[in-house]
Amino acid sequence: MRKTILLFLVLLYNVSMVASPALRIKILVSQPDGTKVTLVKGGDEHISYYITSDNYVVIKNASGAYCYVWQDTVSGFTTGKFLAHDVNDRSRDERVWLERYGVRAAEITVEAKRLRGRQGVSSRSLGRDQFGSPLIPVILVQYSDIKFTVDNVTATYQDYFNAENYTGNGGRGSVRDYFVSQSMGKYTPTFDIVGVITLSNNRSYYGQNDGFYNDVHLDEMVSEAVEKAESSGLDFSKYSNGDGRIPVVSIVYAGVGEQSSDEENAVWAKFSSRTIITKGGTISSYLVTNELFYNSSESVYELDGIGVFCHEFSHFLGLPDFYNTNESTDIFGLSFWSIMDYGQYWANGKIPVGYTAYEREFMGWLSIDTLETKKQLCHVNALGSESQNAYYILNDNDDTRSEYYILENRQPSTWFPKTLGSGLLIMHVDYSYGAWADNEVNNDAAHQRMTIIPADGKLVKENQAMPSDYQGDLFPGITENTSMSDYTTPAFAPYRGGSLGKYITSISESNGVVSFCYMADGILEKPENLSIQNKDGSRVLMWNPVEEAETYCVEVYDGETLVKTQDVSYNFMDLTTVGLVKHPTFKVIAKAARYVDSPAAEISFENPLGVENITGGNGGEEYDVYTIEGVLLCKDKAWDELEDLPNDKIYILRSKKSNTVKKIVNGQYE
């Protein structure tokens, strides 16, 4: 078998490996000395460990006891001499040793980075079939000792991956449903379920860790699965894009994944760009995910949700991780707000969180509008809706246009949980090719490159957060925070230039739509109580003054035709200039330099001096033609000659024979 597997050469062309973050489960461990210690799962696809409540790294020693990690100058990271204990149970010697030798999670950054190397994920979507309807192979594999436990495994996974409106396992959609929804129908993959394939060795052979280094025989596991699938008759060429390249093969393995369990010999779910050669073509990448998830609240193993697969498949499509890949616990990243962070685990992974606006544009599934430096009223429709939209606010101090803020609208829907609240989500992005390529987007606590600006000013990690903490992230949300500037709390805090020099105000939410004023102190109120009154022998249009208004724009319409526009400084206008419009409509708009214009207030009335629109002409008559203000333009025009008059005008016609007064609107006879 070993010789056979070697035929499926694993080529290391720009090899990268990216994975799901550890599900930060707490376990209560009994130690050999009779004590118990509470630990939290940590690590990634390369390194697996546990963390104490005060962030010291712990792994198992050869006898199965949990010990603190220290860094030996010869062996590197290894187990120390002390068993791990909760803070209050530590001896004096143990505390002294920890202060000198103990390794905190943030301190393994160098080792984790060395193992990751350059990840190869892209600064933009990789062009890996983000459009169209590709056929994706999914090979079901089990070990010699760990078999699939779900009933009707092939049929179950056929529905899990492909069923429309899938509700199995407590979900709200299949894997295909998820990507069809995020792409708004632009990407509609079909997953070809293959297997079950039984591997030659037991699970621990493929998934065992070397110290705290993960899955020492994973490549062999994938190559063996591919070889056995091909030997059983699978033609990989049907998955090719036409040039002999098979973009990806997916593996679902029996049992749990190490990232979401305490099974240290289980395989950690991950995506890799390692290349595998088959008779049917060259496989460019693979991803592996697990069958089962341990539901601790009900103490049962159940079919894992689609979240982990959707996360890993999103790596295949080009997205990096937005969690801290070095496992520092003081970095928020995007937490539950993104599937590329902890959002893959929402509802135990059964209902993963939908794509952010950034992720949708990254794929080419959404175009985000850029707000220029002019005041305006903006409306943001919900992500996932037919009319979804989002906005950029650029940092003009950055000539590369790499730093910006994204404003998107989160509303409860299939892929956006009600528990997280609703409103405007503001993200701060500082793109760096190196950070994206190395999969280190949010590894620097002082310079997170993809995170949110919370309305309540508090970023609370998922293992400590209450629902109100997430609801408090949104504007106006439960905090009723309606503005954001360089001087508010929270404030725009760009990394370049010190200040942004832009601001938004009057953030509101109504019927699922978020509105705000950009580069304005607010929106002026609509003028009220419009009326036509007699004043000093003249007809006057009047209205209540609007607070903060500096001028008013009055538009006069004849039907749908704009007759004239007049700016006034007071809350009234003389109507003698209306002329001969019979049924004028007035629209009044309040204006001010630092505010968005008010909505238009409207009133209509019948002008006793006006004339009716012409309804037809007498071919034997001639007309004198006047402007609406009464200026004579020409005399003795026959009816058919009136067609030569310029459009977009209103003319008064006086008949030579009947001396009647009529008019033409926009050069068209009504």
Specify the residue positions occupied by each region the protein language model found.
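Sec-dependent N-terminal signal peptides
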Residues: 4-13
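Conserved aromatic anchor
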Residues: 537-548
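C-terminal outer-membrane/trafficking sorting elements
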Residues: 550-563, 578-583, 587-589, 608-670
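Short S/T/G- and acidic-enriched coil/turn segments that sit immediately N-terminal to beta-strands
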Residues: 568-574
